A protein has these predicted regions:
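C-terminal nucleotide
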Residues: 1-7, 11, 18, 34-74, ...
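Short, solvent-exposed loop/turn segments at secondary-structure junctions
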Residues: 19-21, 89
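Short pre-catalytic strand/loop immediately N-terminal to key active-site residues, enriched for Gly-Thr
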Residues: 78-90
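Short Gly/Pro-enriched turn/cap motifs at secondary-structure boundaries
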Residues: 24-28
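Short, histidine-centered active-site or binding-site loop motifs used for metal coordination
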Residues: 16, 49, 84-86
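DPxDG-like acidic metal-binding loop motif
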Residues: 29-31, 92-114
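Active-site nucleophile and cofactor-binding loops and adjacent substrate-binding regions
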Residues: 93-94, 135, 141
Length: 222
């Protein structure tokens, strides 16, 4: 059985604005999603929500990953099991982690030869397919780890300090949030577009502080 894991992610700066081309800074977290795969007579997806075949309702990201890999190599059967430490709907990029881990495991099992860049790109395509719109931040950070700027994909120095993440326990759908922001932008472009630009500028202002370790300034910008 082949195994692959990928980390979740938080936005330190630039959330939502990055969908519209503005700069964001994403950071990988220690919580991970692990996917194990092996050959099987049919396609079986096993997770905490149950067992299915290709199912775009219950397992949309995994199903899309399998379909993408099937465009490269024929897949008659595969057993794919997911174990995740990342709370779903918590803003920690659980969907990106399961997508990247699934692509990575299938890539190894079927010898597709995909590079990390190609895995990240495929993961982003899947998130766009499932969510309607998505930034490449989640899948890129989940693939490469560390602290990364998007869209220019520059690695920043990882902060030598702890970051506290609070889990409210309240579920929120990324797809719904992205859709709501898009509708708001379409209804009030004169208000929302300048806000997106300012959010991007805050991200750019924060970049050099990661390199110098100026955590006080990073905190103030947050």
């Amino acid at each position: 059985m082949i195994s692959c894991s990928a980390p979740g992610k938080i936005y330190l700066f630039g959330e939502h604005a990055v969908v519209y081309g503005e700069t964001a800074i994403g950071c990988a977290i220690e919580l991970r999603t692990r996917v194990r795969v092996e050959l099987c007579d049919s396609i079986i997806i096993q997770s905490e929500i149950g067992q299915t075949g290709i199912d775009f309702e219950k397992h949309p990201y995994i199903s899309a990953a399998i379909e993408k890999i099937k465009e490269i190599v024929p897949i008659e059967g595969v057993y794919l099991k997911v174990d995740s430490e990342i709370p779903v709907g918590s803003g920690l990029s659980s969907s990106a982690a399961v997508t990247i881990a699934s692509i990575g495991a299938l890539n190894k099992l079927f010898g597709c030869g995909l590079s990390l860049e190609e895995i990240a790109k495929m993961g982003h395509e899947i998130e766009v397919q499932v969510q309607g719109a998505a930034s490449p931040t989640d899948t890129y950070v989940s693939t490469f780890g560390g602290v990364v700027t998007i869209p220019d994909r520059r690695k920043l120095k990882t902060p030598d300090c702890g970051i506290v993440i609070g889990d409210t326990g309240v579920f929120a759908s990324t797809k719904e949030l992205v859709t709501n922001v898009r509708k708001l932008r379409e209804s009030y472009p004169h208000l929302i577009e300048p806000l997106m630009v300012v959010i991007g500028r805050i991200s750019k202002t924060a970049e050099p502080f990661f390199q110098t370790g100026d955590y006080s300034s990073i905190g103030k910008l947050m």
